[in-house]
Amino acid sequence: MDLCDRWEIQALLERHGFRFSKAMGQNFLIEGWVPRDIADASGADEQTGVLEIGPGIGPLTAQLVRRSGKVVSVELDERLYPVLRETMADADNFTLIEGDAMKLDFPQVIREHFAGLRPILCANLPYNITTPVLTKCVESRCFDSLTVLIQKEVAERICAQAGTAEYGAFTVLMQYYTVPELLFTVPPTCFLPAPKVTSAVIHCPVRKTPPVNVVSETTLWRTVKAAFALRRKTLVNSLQTGYQLPKEQLTEIVTACGLPAAVRGERLTLRDFAALTNALAAAEQAK
C-alpha cells in the first residue's frame, strides 16, 4: 500500500470510518518525497531507536521502520489504532503506544524499548502540540537528536538570531539544548487536508554539554521568561516582572553585563542571558 497516495489513503480511511479532526491538528502527508527526506535527515539507521509522535496512518513510520533498529510511535487518536495495525502489520520492529505523548515518561520509554540503540525523535508533529512536545523532549535530555516537520513559522522561531522579530523565549530554550537547522520547507499541497500554512523540517542535534555556564537552569529560564514578558518595553522594565529588585539596581546589573541600559530582551544572545542570569542571582543572594 502506498501510504502517500491520495486515493489509497481515502479508501483506507473510509474502510475504517475515519474523519479528520481539526482539534487534533491532523494533516496527512500525500507526497512520498516528504517522509522519505525526513527519515533521511534524521540519520536513522540499524543502531537507532526512533520515537515518533503523531504517526497518523504511518507514511513516515513506514520509512523509519525500513531504516531503524526499532520504532515506537505514540498516537492519541484511538480511531487510528486499527489503521496503524493494518498499515504496520509487516513491521516486526514497530511498537504502537496508545495514549498522550505529553503524559509519557520519555526516559522510561527509551529504557524499555531502545536498549543498546541511539535514541532520536523523528515526527510530523501536530501543530497544536509542537511547542510543549519539543520542550518536553529537550528537557528530558534523553534524545541524541530531534528531526521534526512543523509549522514554518515555528521553525523560523527556533532557528532565529538575536535581534530579529522571530527571536523569543522558545528560541533561547531550543538553542540552549540543541543546534537547530531548518532543512527544507513543505507546501500545503503535500498534505490531506491541506493546511493554511507552509511547513518546514528542522534537524536539531542535542548538545552534549550546555553552551553556557549558569548558576542554575531554573534561574536562567526565570530570566528569559522575564526578559520577554514585555516585548515593547526595555529589558530593565521586563525584568521587574521576574525579579523583586529596585529598577536602579536592575539598570546597574544590565550595564555591568556590557549591555545598553535601554536594550530590549530580544537583543540578548544566549551568552548575554547567561551573564545576566548569574549577575541577577548574585544580587538576590546579597540581599
Which residues make up each language-model segment?
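C-terminal lobe and adjacent flexible extensions of AdoMet/dcAdoMet transferase-like proteins
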Residues: 225-287
